[in-house]
Amino acid sequence: MEDGHHSPDSTKESKSEEHSKMNGSKLKRDGASNAGNAATPNGSQTGISRPPSMSPDEHKAASESTATPSENVPTQKPSRKASQKNMKREPVLFNHLPDVREEACTHFQVIHDCLYGSKNMGASEHDALDCDCAEEWRGDMNHACGEDSDCINRATKMECVDGDCNCGSGCQNQRFQRKQYADVSVIKTEKKGFGLRANTDLQVNDFIFEYIGEVINEPTFRSRMVKYDKEGIKHFYFMSLTKSEFVDATKKGNLGRFCNHSCDPNCYVDKWVVGDKLRMGIFAGRAIKAGEELVFNYNVDRYGADPQPCYCGEPNCTGFIGGKTQTERATKLPPATIEALGIEDGDSWDTAVAATVKKPRKKKATEDDEEYINRFEPRGLDEEGVTKVMATLMQCKEKWIAVKLLGRLQNADDDHVRNRVVKMHGYQILKTTLNTFKEDTNVVLQILDILYQLPRITKNKITDSNIEAAVEPLTHSDHEDVASQSKRLLQEWSKLETAYRIPRKKLDPSAPVTTNSFEDDRRNVNHEEHPSRPVNPFENMVVPTGPRSNIPQRNMNYFNNQRPRKLPTNLPAGWFVTTDSTGKYYFYDKSGHTQWQRPTTPAVDVPKPSAKVEQNQKALQDIIDSLTKEPTPRHSANQTPKSNTPVPDNGKKEKWRSLPVEKQMKIYENTLFPHVKYVMDKFHRRLPKEDLKRFGREINKKLVASDYKNHRVDDPTTISSNQARKIKKFVKDFFDRAVVKHRENEQRAAQKAGPSSSGAPSPTNGGSAKSPLGRNGASNATVKTQQPDADGDIVLTDVEDEGENTPATSSSDRKRKRAEEQEVPAPASEAIPSPKRAKEDSTTEDSIPSPPPPPPPPTDTPLTEEERSMREQEEALMRENEEAQRLEDEEAERRVSVTVQGAAVATSKVNGVNGTKAHHTSEASPAVSDENGMDAGRDEKSHEQMAQQEPVSR
């Protein structure tokens, strides 16, 4: 764009901005001019004689002039039937001009990010959406979400954010965030002032620059227009971000402000959603050669003001920027919106408009865009058109455009088109549109009808978009159709089930590349070799199936009906991520080091000692623990001292310490159970099976609770022989009492049955009624089993009631039983009884260690001088916005007060008052009324003049 020193003719140009009908308009203004950034097509000129762009005395030698070839000769009016291709010419290269970036940057302050007049300015009003792309690492670069990919976010003009998408960190759809600007130079032209030149070849849709400046509200925009005019600033750099928000790069911005106007542009301006902000960028509209000037169409509308000369020199140049010469030719809608409406594609729109201008159907001066577009019949919607419709609908704020876009979706009856709508974030975008136009019943009915037509297989996308929360209030609407359709839709959604989706495998870019010839062969297969294969309509859909086990499988969204927040992926080797109680991310490594900042280098991994060294260290630690925790046992003379040599361990013994108490108690319960079961087996014929199992579980849990309560457990994975002996004695006493109680209950039951059945044996007695000495036998058996052996252990026998008649157990049998008891293996220290839990714990422990506590809150790092200056400037901008808004509110209140006062005076004049005094008063009243009315009229007229002078469409 022009800046700095200009020729006399060029100083008449100006840049300004159109308010509501344009998608990011921009203009260069002198006095009162309105402009739009939308690259509207440029038809041929009719009915207006075009003055030459240069006066005769302004001609220069070809070697000295930097003007384009057509600047010296007036452009001839193209023929109606002339082809658009015939009007094209070879692009002009400006490689001979020097780079004057340093000089150009002296006319404004260079800033790297937009300054916002308030925290809520520039808000995108869109929820974060996930793309379905997979990570694609080649070397150190993630090639996912590229230009040729089918990335949903890229198609809908949204950038991916690390941690929120499946594509991994550092994908190709982060151009705004990384400031991946094109290589350009600033040149100084003869008539257009400063401009941008491409230093390298650019492809279609390449990102050139973000348009950066101060984001201000409408009152500040109006006041700055007046202020700049008084200061003598001839070139304003305003861009419309939303209906009431503007980007002002007049005094603060970047090199994007130097992009000039052309009637045949090679660039276009578009808005993208980046995180929670709406940002504006300049993109290549076609293939651009190195040395070309970067230009886009301002599409200025001057609202009756004198048009400014256009020096672009293109064959289709209208000769002017602004005025009726340009603005009556077509709508100010951008090409993307025109294509989304299904009127014409971007290439044929210029031709269609040129033909339309010469026919009676040309756009009238009083005709708006809606009336003009209504003359054209939209095309049918196909799968490719869905992408354009959804991208435009996501940022649409004009109701009439939204109605037409929704109408195209509503009339689509192809299942492939509807599936494409769902894939392109259909539920999220329709929810946003519903919230934007929820006051309009017709728009709401359109959206409800589209939602009902969309294919419904699972509830995943419906739940993820949270669209049910937007539809629920409509069930209580006063409009009968809205309420009924909302209830019908919610009822259909309630019948759907949430399908379980296997999460994608996260690729580690630092992992070594493994070759798999089988997978390579599969990837190289040409799928087009089988044209006869029928097309599966469910190929791209996940059809829900039944659960694979009795355990119900549920989606992560089942709980709390919320989408879980995804943790950052692709961290450097050795680093892990988790969240604190407030949901903030922090990072840690295996050594327990924590930090808030995302790590950029692999963690320092302490070398693991060898197995032998580790065993020796463990053995030494066990000796120290045994000496500090237990007193040295005193051995009697007749006892052989036990060896103090520790049993080698594999290093996994102490992993139970990191487990919670509940898991430790479960491990200890499994450790005690073999000893409890050993005693239980001796009573399997003396107690019913179910009672025996129940008693075993109860006594086991009772022992665990008692030992933990009295702090008798040092290691839940093993117990000493002394503990085992006490446990067996306690369990045996418990079961002896249980047997006695069981027999007493049986006897009471037999007595209640009557004398006739008293002699019959009890079926549940297990044969105890066969011997009249059953009770005594049990007592004798108890006495026998409580006799300690030579080692002091309790020897349990299989003596039963009916076994009293059998001979006593021989001494060899007793020795064998003692040997078997001594050979009962204690649970291995490294083995956890549950194989499933052992597998899970080992996997978890080996892959991701338990997260340590979060680091202390980060200290506020001191701001640099530049950061402090930017913060002060942003605070000053906020105060300016607030002051401008306050003044406008006061002015609006004053106008309302004047209008009310004038109406009251006019009413008193009509009523009239008799008498001389009243007569004089009534004569004076009209004067006041007229004066007030003139003031009000003058205010309104002044307001209208301001609206004409400023690029705001009322």
Curated annotation (Swiss-Prot):
Please name the GO terms of the biological process aspect recorded for this protein, alphabetically.
methylation; regulation of DNA-templated transcription
Q: Where is this chain's protein located in or outside the cell?
A: Nucleus; Chromosome
Q: What spans are recorded as compositionally biased (Polar residues)?
A: 34-48, 63-77, 635-647, 777-788, 945-954
GO MF terms held by the record: histone H3K36 methyltransferase activity; histone H3K36 trimethyltransferase activity
Domain Post-SET: where? 306-322
List where Pro residues composition bias occurs.
Answer: 849-860
**Keywords from the named record:** Chromosome, Coiled coil, Methyltransferase, Nucleus, Repressor, S-adenosyl-L-methionine, Transcription, Transcription regulation, Transferase
What are the record's GO terms for cellular component?
chromatin; nucleus
> Region entry Disordered: which residue ranges?
1-90, 507-553, 629-654, 743-954
Q: Which residues form a coiled coil?
A: 863-895
Q: Which reaction does it catalyse?
A: L-lysyl(36)-[histone H3] + 3 S-adenosyl-L-methionine = N(6),N(6),N(6)-trimethyl-L-lysyl(36)-[histone H3] + 3 S-adenosyl-L-homocysteine + 3 H(+)
Q: Give the EC class as a word.
A: transferase
Residue ranges of every copy of the AWS domain listed in the record: 126-180
SET domain spans which residues? 182-299
Q: Does the keyword Nucleus apply?
A: yes
Entry remark concerning the domains of this protein:
The AWS and SET domains are necessary for transcription repression.
Asked if the Swiss-Prot or TrEMBL record annotates the protein with the keyword S-adenosyl-L-methionine, the reply is: yes
Q: What is this protein called?
A: Histone-lysine N-methyltransferase, H3 lysine-36 specific
The residue ranges of the WW domain are: 569-601
* InterPro entries (UniProt xref): AWS_dom, Post-SET_dom, Set2_fungi, SET2_Histone-Lys_MeTrsfase, SET_dom, SET_dom_sf, SETD2/Set2_SET, SRI
- Write down the superkingdom of origin: Eukaryota
Question: Which spans does this entry mark as compositional bias, Basic and acidic residues?
Answer: 1-31, 519-532, 865-896
**Family statement drawn from the similarity comment of this UniProt entry:** Belongs to the class V-like SAM-binding methyltransferase superfamily. Histone-lysine methyltransferase family. SET2 subfamily.
Q: What does this protein do?
A: Histone methyltransferase that trimethylates histone H3 'Lys-36' forming H3K36me3. Involved in transcription elongation as well as in transcription repression.
User: Where is composition skewed (Low complexity) in this entry?
Assistant: 750-769
Q: What is its EC number?
A: 2.1.1.359
